[in-house]
Amino acid sequence: DEAMALSTLRLAWSEGVLEREASIKSMVQLAAARGIPDHAARMIESGFEQGLLPRDETFVRLLANAWVSAKENKLAIGAFRRLSEIAKNGEPLVRVANLYLEMGQWQQAEQALEKAIDLGLDDAGSAYLLLGIVLAEQDNYKESFVALRRARSFEKTQRQAAKWLSYAEDMRKQYEWQRAYRG
């Protein structure tokens, strides 16, 4: 069973006899499956430090996802940033943006999305949509409308972007009204 397999692999790891990349990967995946993703992440980092694991796309992605599962957003952000550098694309930075949003850090999310778009994405429409939302939430309506219009130009995000454009316009009107009556 999984618990026994994990125990066996952990013992081999602690005794320093677990050196094969595939075995370490199995142990990491079992730890994550058993609900101890923080342990899995620490094993990966230890494998990196000991030179047992390559700092490649596969293992850095495993590390990032383990930190997400462990609810260690700051550590996950660092791992996803490294993954973006290794993969040479912006997909991991969209994950970074989402983690920043979970933490209520709008500006950091905006920066991550802009960099993700610059690096290139398979699903740029969703990134533009999210960027438009982030900008609207920061009362930056002019740039929000630009991003949302870009999102509307992609078939996948066309409907959502159109709805957000309407909503952002309402937000802008309310914002302008509040500014006019406060002053």
Q: For each of these PLM feature ranges, what is it?
A:
Residues 1-183:
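Alpha-solenoid helical repeat scaffolds
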